[in-house]
């Protein structure tokens, strides 16, 4: 692996070669059979378990560096691997193997009056670049998902997890080799310098078809700003939970606690709670007391503080803040119209949920809010590819082009048209 001391020209040359290898591997991978791809995935899962000791030793090196660098406990937790987490990674790869193969699926077909038969068929995207921070499991998830969808992938993880990711990558390559697929179909960037990211964002001379960033706001913002190829991403998850006056209170209380507190550091965690002003006297205080009992800090608007003085005053900045912590901003709104207005003003278009029994209110919520994921009577924390039955996800996209919401194997494909005739001409 190169070091940060390498020159920009060296890095550009190395990355160009990575791109060439990925593009060369993409061609045979695109026509690999379902059986081949599944055999590679299952062999990779087996190799992951066989290499458990090596992976844990590599992870110890990364953890020691993290401790030396004074990294936060939450960072260390994301970085750490143990027997259980390695088993979960292997299980996740097997789950991806069990998914239907999207490649070659006929999405639609029809006949024309002139006798032409037209089919729209799923095809791989080609080469995917995945840029992520120090989560070793993303190495396995991204590699496996791209393989299942017939794509070559270039993985660039954070330098803090370099040893762990390299050990996991070896297991993925063993899987490819066991199935007779090109080892270069899953590559890990051999450069620690951040200049490698810049080269990927340029597209590696046309080698990369799409970039998927997985990480914090600064990483995603850089990718979205600098990328010269399409990007599947979300900048942040400012997710809202609206409690309508028609909501069942017991249900609302359970959903509010889960949406905020189940895991506060994920992009699907609720950051703002909106309560129908018409139900505030009955609904607001019990819900906030439940959240406070779980050590959640409440930041409320002036009318919320009037009913729940224990809250801290919310500022304008709070309504557009992704806390990723045990903090929630709370406001009263004038029914479904007020909720829609607030959400459309402050949302990052990731995930929003409504708790209501009024079908008309739910219909307006679904129709008038333009976010990637909308839920009714369910926690925002279901915003997850696994929970959607996708097996896993490479990320969540909030853009409107191609992929939106959880990005699983189907979203990692494009399509082409097959047109069958029997001698038709347009003359």
UniProtKB/Swiss-Prot annotation:
<dbReference type="InterPro" id="IPR016163">
    <property type="entry name" value="Ald_DH_C"/>
</dbReference>
<dbReference type="GO" id="GO:0050661">
    <property type="term" value="F:NADP binding"/>
</dbReference>
<dbReference type="GO" id="GO:0005737">
    <property type="term" value="C:cytoplasm"/>
</dbReference>
<comment type="similarity">
    <text>Belongs to the gamma-glutamyl phosphate reductase family.</text>
</comment>
<protein>
    <recommendedName>
        <fullName>Gamma-glutamyl phosphate reductase</fullName>
        <ecNumber>1.2.1.41</ecNumber>
    </recommendedName>
</protein>
<comment type="function">
    <text>Catalyzes the NADPH-dependent reduction of L-glutamate 5-phosphate into L-glutamate 5-semialdehyde and phosphate. The product spontaneously undergoes cyclization to form 1-pyrroline-5-carboxylate.</text>
</comment>
<dbReference type="GO" id="GO:0004350">
    <property type="term" value="F:glutamate-5-semialdehyde dehydrogenase activity"/>
</dbReference>
<keyword id="KW-0028">Amino-acid biosynthesis</keyword>
<keyword id="KW-0521">NADP</keyword>
<keyword id="KW-0560">Oxidoreductase</keyword>
<comment type="pathway">
    <text>Amino-acid biosynthesis; L-proline biosynthesis; L-glutamate 5-semialdehyde from L-glutamate: step 2/2.</text>
</comment>
<dbReference type="Pfam" id="PF00171">
    <property type="entry name" value="Aldedh"/>
</dbReference>
<dbReference type="InterPro" id="IPR000965">
    <property type="entry name" value="GPR_dom"/>
</dbReference>
<dbReference type="GO" id="GO:0055129">
    <property type="term" value="P:L-proline biosynthetic process"/>
</dbReference>
<dbReference type="InterPro" id="IPR016161">
    <property type="entry name" value="Ald_DH/histidinol_DH"/>
</dbReference>
<dbReference type="InterPro" id="IPR015590">
    <property type="entry name" value="Aldehyde_DH_dom"/>
</dbReference>
<dbReference type="InterPro" id="IPR012134">
    <property type="entry name" value="Glu-5-SA_DH"/>
</dbReference>
<keyword id="KW-0641">Proline biosynthesis</keyword>
<dbReference type="InterPro" id="IPR016162">
    <property type="entry name" value="Ald_DH_N"/>
</dbReference>
<keyword id="KW-0963">Cytoplasm</keyword>
